[in-house]
């Protein structure tokens, strides 16, 4: 968290840890029962805070900490970003980017054994464009999946390709909640600034590109070896190529982010360009963005804000809960325990970060954003103590945290895909266990990320890189 004052405020360990433990425990339980709902999690978090407020012996210090972290720079930055991202992503969808990608895949006339490779790449491109793994899975399960079944692609591989593409965009899209949280929660040692989003994405590109290349190879080989589905003509393939023009705003946002242009300016530039392209080419009208009908207000802009509002509130609640652990001294106790085992080894510190992040991702696999928010303060504290560069911390956090929702049977992304396949009318019988190994990209990225913990580079620690990235 971006708070320079980390002085303990005399909170009892029980009052500090119990609210956080209640929230995490409830989230894990709901994950296993496939009953995760963001609004419910917000309610659970608020109840947990109130319980802590009742049992604390230092009421003033408790509530001061809650409100300070609730409105912290970390929480407010992510909130503003997500609201803008919600608008941006909805405008792209309104511009028929999904239909454009489906059109391109059909015109490429790919064979059934290579269609999974194309599905992975197009799903990844859509995820990078919108920054939404869930949105990608929802869109592609209703479009590319039935198109792939029509040309005879293996259903389990096809589902794995969609999950892999969604995971790809979740790691490197500047507008992804994963990329945002992984960057803005990791502070420099002086505590005065946090890692910039463009720099962190650029830092993990070698890992992501390596895993992506291996994924393409795996999908191609598996597509030739595994049984195929019966091919059939499909009426689901779209002829709307104009939607491909919505890729241009995405390229602008990515390019500006890499050039260290402020992320808010980058996103605004992308939104303006998307609106200009969409209205000029007749993809949508201004009334599709904001529409007033009597007492009702609708449109892509309004829906984009509404779609992000609850997750923003959840973020502020969880940040407040983690603030209690930091201010009570519990965080220092945890770090002291770990330091006795890590000692002065940077590699062991990074492996500890890797392991903690993996455990968090496994336990809270329903919504990776929540797992990311919960573990980020611990990653930040361990990294600062061992002078691990914020870029490197962010890379481990972003590449590891999102693996498990895409592969575990109770993972939110896996369950969403199954629902989308059922709704697509593809008449395919597919279980979550059938796709445990077929999302090649998350598994390969996990291996590449673990390997990177043993490889030194110029962004290994802050003492060897004092530049202002």
Language model region names:
Residues 13-26, 36-57, 78-85, 117, ...:
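Hydrophobic mid-bilayer segments of alpha-helices in multi-pass membrane transport proteins
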Residues 113-126, 152-169, 348-361, 386-406, ...:
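Alpha-helical transmembrane segments of multi-pass membrane proteins
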